[in-house]
């Protein structure tokens, strides 16, 4: 099986889009762009379209499509397959492989399998609202074939006129702040990815209201890497990485292509 547009749209709705290449951590070897695509094919100052970003996402997701397909021992619907791929892309194929969710599913107990989605709402032992929402939507898609706010058509990220501002040619952060009657400092707090107020770019989406955006940094493990090496490169500890990635039960049992959280 392959993932449908509805499945891709579900993943897109939670991953977030960045059309300009960036380094979330200065020590990273490569840049990231689009819906979290990272690698040697991403170059400094590179800008891509939303269509290209989706193409890169589909390429990245294919590994999880193939992985889920191999793990299944029962027939599933397209919507159920989409939900499982979204789940695996978020928590890792290793986590899905060892999960009770997969055990119930392969035993033919679809209802119990669906209920297992909701248990995967923590990171580092703490419940996160974003994970709660993602698991709820995956479960709903799995059971009913419909996921709230996710279309089956090719879609572009939704923007809110009251909460975001798309940078236009000639815009400065101070002018945007003045226009919406706030301060540059507040905008910087709401947009932690903006490190330099003088370096914003046309097309960039800036959060102008609500709570500060919590930065979630993901990293895709490459062949030959160890958790110790990744921790050292990103100036953290193995213990902290394991807290952020509760699906990693053994620090020595990670694999190339696995996506983990760094913060």
From Swiss-Prot:
Subcellular location(s) of the protein: Host cytoplasm
InterPro entries for this protein: Bacteriophage_GH24, Endolysin_autolysin, Endolysin_T4_type, Glyco_hydro_24, LysM_dom, LysM_dom_sf, Lysozyme-like_dom_sf, Lysozyme_dom_sf
Coiled coil: none
Catalytic residues (positions): 15 (proton donor/acceptor)
Gene3D superfamilies xrefs: 1.10.530.40, LysM domain
UniProt catalytic activity: Hydrolysis of (1->4)-beta-linkages between N-acetylmuramic acid and N-acetyl-D-glucosamine residues in a peptidoglycan and between N-acetyl-D-glucosamine residues in chitodextrins
Disulfide-linked positions: none
GO-annotated molecular function: lysozyme activity
Enzyme Commission designation: 3.2.1.17
SMART domains, sorted: LysM
Uppermost EC category: hydrolase
Gene Ontology BP terms: cell wall macromolecule catabolic process; defense response to bacterium; peptidoglycan catabolic process; viral release from host cell by cytolysis
One matching Pfam family: LysM
Keywords: Antimicrobial, Bacteriolytic enzyme, Cytolysis, Glycosidase, Host cell lysis by virus, Host cytoplasm, Hydrolase, Viral release from host cell
GO cellular component: host cell cytoplasm
Chain's role: Endolysin with lysozyme activity that degrades host peptidoglycans and participates with the holin and spanin proteins in the sequential events which lead to the programmed host cell lysis releasing the mature viral particles. Once the holin has permeabilized the host cell membrane, the endolysin can reach the periplasm and break down the peptidoglycan layer.
Family label: Belongs to the glycosyl hydrolase 24 family.
HAMAP family to which the protein is assigned, alphabetical: ENDOLYSIN_T4
Entry remark concerning the domains of this protein: LysM domains are thought to be involved in peptidoglycan binding.
UniProt name for this protein: Endolysin
Source species of the chain: Bacillus phage B103
Gene this chain is encoded by: 15
């Amino acid at each position: 099986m392959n993932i449908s547009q509805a499945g891709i749209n579900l993943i897109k709705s939670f991953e977030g889009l960045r059309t300009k290449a960036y380094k979330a951590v200065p020590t990273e070897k490569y840049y990231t762009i689009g819906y979290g695509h990272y690698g040697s094919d991403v170059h400094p100052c590179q800008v891509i379209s939303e269509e290209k970003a989706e193409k890169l996402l589909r390429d990245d997701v294919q590994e999880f499509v193939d992985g889920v397909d191999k793990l299944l021992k029962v027939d599933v619907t397209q919507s159920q397959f989409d939900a499982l791929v979204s789940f695996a892309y978020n928590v890792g194929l290793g986590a899905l492989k060892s999960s009770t969710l997969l055990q119930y599913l392969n035993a033919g107990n679809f209802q119990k399998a669906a209920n297992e989605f909701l248990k995967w709402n923590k990171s580092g032992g703490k419940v996160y609202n974003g994970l709660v929402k993602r698991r709820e939507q995956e479960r709903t898609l799995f059971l009913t074939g419909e996921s709230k706010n996710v279309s089956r058509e090719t879609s572009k990220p939704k923007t809110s006129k009251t909460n975001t501002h798309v940078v236009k040619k000639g815009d400065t952060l101070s002018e945007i702040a003045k226009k919406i009657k706030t301060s540059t400092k507040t905008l910087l707090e709401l947009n932690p990815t903006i490190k330099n107020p003088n370096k914003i770019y046309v097309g960039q989406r800036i959060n102008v209201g609500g709570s500060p955006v919590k930065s979630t940094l993901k990293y895709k493990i490459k062949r030959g890497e160890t958790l110790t090496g990744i921790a050292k490169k990103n100036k953290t500890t193995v213990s902290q990485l394991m807290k952020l990635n509760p699906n990693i039960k053994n620090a020595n049992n990670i694999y190339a292509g696995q996506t983990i959280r760094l913060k």
